[in-house]
Amino acid sequence: MTKIINGLSDVLDEYDVVLIDQYGVLHNGTIPYIGAVDCFNRMIQAGKQVILLSNTSHRSCGLPIKLGPMGFSTSFQGVTGGEVCHTYLLERPDTHARCSLMTSDLDGKVTKRASNPESTFHGLGVEIVPLDKAQFLMVDGTQQICYSDRVTEVLPTDYRHTGEVNDAMKEFLRGGLERKLPLLCPNPDVLAVMANDRFVHMGGGIAKLYEEMGGEVIYFGKPMKEHFEVCLRMAHVTDKSKVVHIGDSLHHDIQGAKNTGVDSIFIAGGVHARELSVNAWGTDEKQLRVKPDLLENLLERTQLDPTYTMTRYTW
């Protein structure tokens, strides 16, 4: 059974390498969680090798741009789903030259890709085309369906906020399935917790639906073991017992750590906060205390057992 700890300093001396998630652990997309900046910077000052491991569809160069202004040290390495997907496409210019796309921002990610190094499409010649000309589908966001690089032709969806699959999305998925197109998913997250503890629906939910329909999905990110192993190679790890992964998603972070054979620290106040009746923004003991019975029930349901658990990422 997982051990509940008060803060990272309780166990940090056990490890040399720390892999850490960002959303739900360090920040909510807008502001840092209470104590997170201090904890992160102390961790780096303690001489730990830190690798930010994120399911974002943005490339790794965007991590310090996001975290630095919040006060986090930028003395870390980074691996993102978008970065690994970019490498995958870069190595397959012939078989992955044309795609039909779901995204959050066609203009920024595709039309202006040359000036946006964070885009998965930066430096690539991938064309956005209709389904009958596509070699693959890609879901790197959930707000626009695109069959060309013209912003005026995007088909909007409200899946991010409602989780509802509209007719345009159904056509996108059915069209890919009929043509036996693989779907690339650089962010396997199904849900994410944002500002004001608001949940949004992510591309992983679309990929899961395509899989359930019988389609082929290629995931880039957690919980895929390959994603974690990129980090281990970057850190030149020879002893996995000296590595810990910190994250808030049992299905992605804790499952991925288990798949890879490394220890894990589960942040209860992230995406599972409602299930565990904790509040990472709380100021009193009642709001912050992880209730063992709720935690045990959740872990039993998911068949996962993180090495340690704490409410929020604090020192």
Residue ranges and their predicted role:
Residues M1-Q45, T56, S60-Q77, H86, ...:
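Asp-based, Mg2+/Mn2+-dependent phosphohydrolase catalytic module
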